[in-house]
Amino acid sequence: MDLPWNDERSNKFITNVGLITTNGPYGADVMACEWTHHVSYRPGLIAVCIGPNKATHENIKQTKEFGVNLCSTDQSIMSSVAGGYTGSRYNKINALKELGFEFYEAKKIKATMIKGAA
């Protein structure tokens, strides 16, 4: 996917938290990632920084797949839950579903995606 200069979709990277979704040894998981950066327009590339001792890192290492969901302005609670707990001990997806957040299955990868995210 190419993102031409001044494309409206690029503006979503300015201040949004990235929610990284995975599905692997730790099950379906979501992690808040402040370090989600738009690095190229053509091709459209995103860089994320994930610590090596995180459940998300292990899920990605095992499956080679992850989803990047950019928080919408009404998803600050989701960001707090995703960033405040470890996926190795807590099922954050189920907790967020109980809070009313919705998810869907991605078309090309096995990671769960967040409904309403950019």
Predicted regions and their residues:
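Active-site-proximal mixed secondary-structure blocks
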Residues: 1-118
